[in-house]
């Protein structure tokens, strides 16, 4: 039953209009979706937000993209799922708890309620019955359950490894979470620490993960993903074909045992340069480094300094390359020559074998290291017979196709592929190496030394204590029937470590195997675990018996995923892995979670600041400054309103609270209404590109909606009384119908290709066409008006649903065709596009002199006759006799006199 609507006001009042629309949709439970096999399904989802408590216009843009897609596809007959939830675990809640002395659970749930209250006025068609918060026990129970399944399959395992340690957030960071050597949340310089933790064997899936982003012939290739994202994942997975081999040695520890069994292994993709090795470098944690440091205090001190830094390739690529000699030597595997071993701060223990061969003549990093420390440089590859030059050393490394080995004994004179094969064969013959494929991708460490996350379901049993004959059971998985391991929600972190370690109620437990006193694991899971499968839980959020059920089979894989490019490597790669692991555990039947991916652009805004004597910047809100513009409208200066003194133009930047250039949706909605906020964020530019916020642009969108309201209410009686018969329509009505259906065809095309900025401009052109049509007061012309306005309202509805809904009700469309929620997308009337009259450009001696209207069926002779009879020709020919008439069909007529 339709909710009553108030009689429309003569003025556009978005507050009342939008409140009435919300009441109507709520009464109908309009956005609840159920599985329906009689219709094609479409699952469109935005990446779930972290509940920071504040919605910004970037959120509005992202969710409006999703909403426009969902509403349009529903009109096209699809059963569309558009859910929303909350990525609710994580460090910000703990940091806020420390600052505000409030439990993270309370802070998080308060923020969820606040953000939800900010979303609802936007009219987003989320199915809130499927809402998920990852901090709810009925969600993270399944994180724990699946972790135990992965443990059973050997995909989850425990090991001790050198990791990235964030000293501020006091937790381990995955390599992907270290940005320019700093923690992605805290911004603090990371350190290296050796620490035990749980890992997920994502590398077991490296081949499949790579194939679906790198090989178009792969059955699961992600054709619907942006090439940029596929390339980012391909690079991160980083498949490398090369040779793994060992440098033998006689280095022994204090007990006389060979360190590392007398072999120091390395991997190289350039085995053709093996005879150019003049040194080797090992990681600070390598057994040879540890052995040498035991008797060398200076080396030991250097190794300690190396720990003050992260373990990511990106960080090591940019930091200064430093090293210390160990005094140790290994043997070259082919020549037998002694090779000095150095400790290098740029070598990672977690990558390969923690050692690299140094070939200064043919590697940029090795060259810089050798020049710095006076190590020999030996050319072993040349191009076109040229010899090594310090000015052109890069050429010998980069040009694999033309390079030929030299100074390499019996391996000289070989091309790159032949040399690699020969070196691999020679090493294999000695049992020292062979060809191997390696990966840049590393297993995913999920242990975090933080409180606000999913508890890892492990119990540590050490037995019954001193004197007991019970040796303990070690690490024992929590029995499935005891899940979930509940996270206590009343703890308040104080910044001194994980509060779970101090909670006796959580920590102390009986061993499930032997009953002896034991302790729970206090590490929690990386929050990327939570976001790796939430989109499947949306499909069946009330499932108590299973992680996912048959409803997941109906909706998944997702048809369209929407989110920022910043998630290309972290979230999107983990989600792909998680899906494949679920498949291999028999939980899902598909290989990839997201058929199509859309990466929206950022919303930008002007920024303004003033620097104090110490160089610290104070950022001003746009409302706090007056800006001066040049004659082209470009900002050239600004002053603070508070004191009239200059402030600096920071330029157009991403909206950021730290720079005070965030535009609050609440402010825009209060001033202009939600439809204006939605409309401008779409009109500002292509959705996949960044766009700048503009107050004047928002005002322009508001003026358009006000014009639409004024025009539609003025035409109310004519539209309500109109029929659908276009017989005897006037020329103006015929032209209007053609314009309307041409625009409808274009708008439909733009919806299909997600070009929502041109959808909005198409809606604006539709209103222009309706306003400018000089229609007669006849039944046929009123029918053309009714049709055109109805098409406009449906075209605009996904972008500005409130005003479209109100006018649809008021103008009588709902009474005749049902609720706009259920209205089908309008079809293009091909007959309306057929022209019975066309307009040609009229030229005289090649100069534009007017326009010529002729029947669309007119042949060349009829067009010539019309041109010769036109008053424009008589005016500009000035009595001269036409010599020639040139007709360009469908475009122009040129009369030569």
UniProtKB/Swiss-Prot annotation:
Record EC number: 6.1.1.4
The keyword Kinase is annotated on this UniProt entry: no
Entry's localization field: Cytoplasm
Any one GO cellular component localisation term in the record: cytosol
Classification via InterPro entries: aa-tRNA-synth_I_CS, aa-tRNA-synth_Ia, Leu-tRNA-ligase, Leu_tRNA-synth_edit, M/V/L/I-tRNA-synth_anticd-bd, Methionyl/Leucyl_tRNA_Synth, Rossmann-like_a/b/a_fold, tRNAsynth_Ia_anticodon-bd
PROSITE patterns xrefs: AA_TRNA_LIGASE_I
Disulfide bonds: none
Molecular function GO labels: aminoacyl-tRNA deacylase activity; ATP binding; leucine-tRNA ligase activity
Motif residue range(s): 'KMSKS' region: 654-658
Protein name (record): Leucine--tRNA ligase
Residues spanned by motif 'HIGH' region: 49-59
Catalytic activity: tRNA(Leu) + L-leucine + ATP = L-leucyl-tRNA(Leu) + AMP + diphosphate
Domain of life, source organism: Bacteria
Pfam family, one: tRNA-synt_1
Keywords: Aminoacyl-tRNA synthetase, ATP-binding, Cytoplasm, Ligase, Nucleotide-binding, Protein biosynthesis
GO aspect biological process, one term: leucyl-tRNA aminoacylation
Similarity comment: family membership: Belongs to the class-I aminoacyl-tRNA synthetase family.
NCBIfam families per record: leuS_bact (TIGR00396)
Residues that coordinate or bind ATP: 657
UniProt main location, coarse: cytoplasm
